[in-house]
UniProtKB/Swiss-Prot annotation:
It is a peripheral membrane protein. Keywords: ATP-binding, Cell inner membrane, Cell membrane, Ion transport, Membrane, Nickel, Nickel transport, Nucleotide-binding, Translocase, Transport. Gene3D superfamilies: P-loop containing nucleotide triphosphate hydrolases. SUPFAM superfamilies: P-loop containing nucleoside triphosphate hydrolases (SSF52540). GO terms for cellular component: plasma membrane. ATP binds at G36, G37, S38, G39, S40, G41, K42, S43. It holds the Pfam family ABC_tran. This is Nickel import ATP-binding protein NikD.
Length: 254
């Protein structure tokens, strides 16, 4: 399994250019946070890495490399990169139970799909009464439960890399804290490389090792999390950090 995945000079276009020469490097055991405002190109960049660009959007430049060798996004998706999506409800077939979803995921990746394996993954993400959960349909579960189920699926994949696209969006404070606890636990136990897409600098401060800031389809600043919080250089970064500090009655040093 690869130890590093690199997005190199990725450019995306629809009727007009959307993402301009984005380069990111994911390393096993480290969390890279990709931050920026809505429409900055974060989710499109993730879609390019997974080979799931929306209709009308095409990649016009750049490549993806695994341990320095060019690779197709389709060869990475699922096997080498697990995904935790922004809207978990849209990721599940409403006609299938959680048992069917989990079992089919495992079988597609050649992983064990016995009930004991599925139950262990569900219990690992804090969902009580795994036997009952496996019988549930998506409409019978809350957003927080579905997000935890998404994380359970990522655990089942045993992929060396994870892309988590706004994993705490639209969840209440308690559910957000639980999801962050789970992501932290995965990093400690499995040490994948994680691309964490978020607009919440509190999430960045808690989980990230490195940060890349996007604005208007470009990476405008990139570095380790401590340096970025203590000495942000770009105006967009300074704005994000200042807004976060203001929540605690603090100000960014001049």
């Amino acid at each position: 399994m690869p130890q590093q995945i690199e997005l190199r000079d990725i450019a995306l276009q629809a009727a007009q250019p959307l993402v301009h020469g984005v380069s990111l490097t994911l390393q096993r055991g480290r969390v890279l946070a990709l931050v920026g405002g809505s429409g900055s190109g974060k989710s499109l960049t993730c879609a390019a890495a997974l080979g799931i660009l929306p209709a009308g959007v095409r990649q016009t430049a750049g490549e993806i490399l695994a341990d320095g060798k060019p690779v197709s996004p389709c060869a990475l998706r699922g096997i080498k990169i697990a995904t935790i999506m922004q809207n978990p409800r849209s990721a599940f077939n409403p006609l299938h139970t959680m048992h069917t979803h989990a079992r089919e995921t495992c079988l597609a990746l050649g992983k064990p799909a016995d009930d004991a394996t599925l139950t262990a993954a569900i219990e690992a993400v804090g969902l009580e009464n795994a036997a009952r959960v496996l019988k549930l349909y998506p409409f019978e579960m809350s957003g927080g439960m579905l997000q935890r189920m998404m994380i359970a699926m990522a655990v089942l994949c045993e992929s060396p890399f994870i892309i988590a696209d706004e994993p705490t969006t639209d969840l209440d404070v308690v559910a957000q804290a639980r999801i962050l606890d789970l992501l932290e636990s995965i990093m400690q136990k499995q040490a994948p490389g994680m691309l964490l897409v978020t607009h919440d600098m509190g999430v960045v401060a808690r989980l990230a090792d490195d940060v890349a800031v996007m604005s208007d389809g470009k990476i405008v600043e990139q570095g380790d999390v401590e340096t970025l919080f203590n000495a942000p250089k770009h105006a967009v970064t300074r704005s994000l950090v200042s807004a976060h500090l203001a929540l605690y009655g603090m100000e960014l040093a001049s």
